[in-house]
């Protein structure tokens, strides 16, 4: 056995084994800046009302100045991507919708687009189904941004804004419940189309919302935009320029607030977005204030898109015609919420043994997807949401991986917060709008 200041070495049956002795600790200490004696380490989270979920921030402070910040994630890991490998392709929609729980319809749409690309049926998706997807995603974008404005304002002291933001979001959730049967975790967008059609009463409620929301946005701006404390807490705080965003892969409102108009709905269109008229809001300051203005402007643009989508809705099927892929979507749920009348069952399952067998195999085993791999990216409220789906030719995914914007954007927090005040960590972190369900998944 030999020894050194750093490790001991010994021979074993498996080969050389080194044991670290820590003898170099004195060298580390001697090289430490004496000013570090005044620094303390503080844990913010994982149970903290201002970290947008179970996020842990490890802060090294010198007085009230943040010298070092580390994000610790993983507290909300649910193993969704792994679980999808044991479910058929349609059942995957019920898993992905639970990741970013504030933007479930984006998770579902990205997944459905990836599966449809593997199947080679992108051109078979009906116009009505595609329009409904755009309609639902833009309503979801509005509700997500409303939560951001509400929670960020609350964290910076404007509690009344939280009440107003959640009040308007409730209106959107009622629309979702009317269309999908659920307020959240819808599993509504599925490979081949959507689960069922949009009822007429939902269209009337959407038009009421389109009339209401612009007035509420004006109230938000009156409440916050000219408020001196809000301006002081957001302007020149959490600054990250376009170069920093690109270096770290940051996308979404954070990137657009730095002056780069990168929006996948414009640059790499999907779901027919190239046929809609809307603008991509940008700002130039790259601070919390700029991100606030960009998100409010995006709500206005989404309202335009929702109105165009509603006007475009034409009667027609909402699921592909191929019965080897399509789950029944032509019937609405009955007033009893069940829809299990004899007529309902007869239309779905048919009236022969062969039809029943086909329906049973489609639901339990699922359809087969040709072997291959694809990547599909869409513009979610927090940035680029990407799906890498791999098929080995079976009825279940070989691998499904999500490029989650919350996870990617969080790595920019140290660059935004280090050198600033601890109070500005709250504003900077909130401006990234992380949702830990999506980040940790």
Swiss-Prot record:
Annotated compartments: Cell membrane
Membrane topology: Peripheral membrane protein
The keyword Translocase belongs to this UniProt entry's keyword annotation: yes
Domain of life: Bacteria
InterPro entries: NADH_Q_OxRdtase_suD (IPR001135), NADH_UbQ_OxRdtase_49kDa_CS (IPR014029), NDH1_su_D/H (IPR022885), NiFe-Hase_large (IPR029014)
Main location: membrane
EC number: 7.1.1.-
Quaternary structure note: NDH-1 is composed of 14 different subunits. Subunits NuoB, C, D, E, F, and G constitute the peripheral sector of the complex.
Xref: PANTHER family: NADH DEHYDROGENASE [UBIQUINONE] IRON-SULFUR PROTEIN 2, MITOCHONDRIAL (PTHR11993:SF10), NADH-UBIQUINONE OXIDOREDUCTASE 49 KDA SUBUNIT (PTHR11993)
Role description: NDH-1 shuttles electrons from NADH, via FMN and iron-sulfur (Fe-S) centers, to quinones in the respiratory chain. The immediate electron acceptor for the enzyme in this species is believed to be a menaquinone. Couples the redox reaction to proton translocation (for every two electrons transferred, four hydrogen ions are translocated across the cytoplasmic membrane), and thus conserves the redox energy in a proton gradient.
Homology family: Belongs to the complex I 49 kDa subunit family.
The protein, known as: NADH-quinone oxidoreductase subunit D 1
């Amino acid at each position: 056995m030999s020894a050194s200041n750093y490790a001991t070495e010994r021979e074993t049956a498996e080969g050389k084994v080194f044991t670290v002795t820590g003898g170099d600790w004195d060298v580390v200490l001697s090289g430490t800046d004496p000013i570090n004696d005044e620094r303390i380490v503080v844990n913010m989270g994982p149970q903290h009302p201002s970290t947008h979920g179970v996020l842990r921030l490890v802060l090294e402070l010198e007085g009230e100045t943040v010298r070092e910040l580390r994000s610790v994630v993983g507290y909300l890991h649910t193993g969704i991507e792994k679980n999808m490998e044991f479910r058929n392709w349609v059942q995957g929609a019920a898993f992905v919708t639970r990741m970013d729980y504030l933007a479930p319809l984006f998770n579902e749409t990205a997944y459905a687009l990836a599966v449809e690309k593997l199947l080679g049926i992108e051109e078979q998706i009906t116009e009505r189904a595609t329009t409904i997807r755009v309609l639902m995603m833009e309503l979801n974008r509005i509700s997500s941004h409303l939560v951001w404005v509400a929670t960020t304002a609350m964290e910076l002291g404007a509690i009344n804004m939280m009440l107003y933001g959640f009040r308007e979001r409730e209106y959107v959730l009622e629309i979702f419940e009317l269309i999908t049967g659920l307020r959240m975790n819808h599993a509504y967008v599925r490979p081949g189309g959507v689960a069922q059609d949009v009822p007429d009463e939902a269209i009337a409620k959407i038009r009421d919302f389109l009339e209401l929301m612009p007035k509420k946005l004006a109230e938000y701006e009156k409440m916050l935009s000219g408020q001196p404390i809000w301006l002081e807490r957001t302007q020149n705080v959490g600054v990250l320029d376009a170069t920093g965003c690109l270096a770290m892969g940051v996308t979404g409102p954070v990137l657009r607030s730095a002056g780069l108009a990168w929006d996948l709905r414009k640059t790499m269109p999907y779901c027919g977005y190239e046929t809609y008229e809307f603008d991509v809001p940008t700002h130039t300051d790259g601070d919390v204030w700029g991100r606030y203005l960009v998100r409010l402007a995006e709500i206005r643009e989404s309202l335009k898109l929702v109105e165009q989508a509603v006007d475009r809705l034409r009667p027609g099927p909402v699921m592909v015609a191929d019965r080897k892929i399509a789950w029944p979507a032509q019937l609405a749920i009955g007033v009893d919420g069940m829809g299990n009348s004899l007529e309902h069952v007869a239309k779905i399952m048919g009236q022969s043994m062969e039809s029943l067998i086909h329906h049973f195999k489609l639901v339990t085993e699922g359809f087969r997807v040709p072997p291959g791999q694809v990547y599909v990216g869409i513009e979610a409220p927090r940035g680029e949401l990407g799906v890498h789906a791999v098929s080995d030719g079976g009825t279940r995914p070989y691998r499904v991986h999500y490029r989650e914007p919350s996870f990617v954007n969080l790595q920019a927090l140290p660059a935004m917060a280090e050198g600033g005040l601890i109070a500005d960590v709250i504003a900077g972190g909130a401006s990234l709008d992380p949702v830990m369900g999506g980040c940790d998944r």
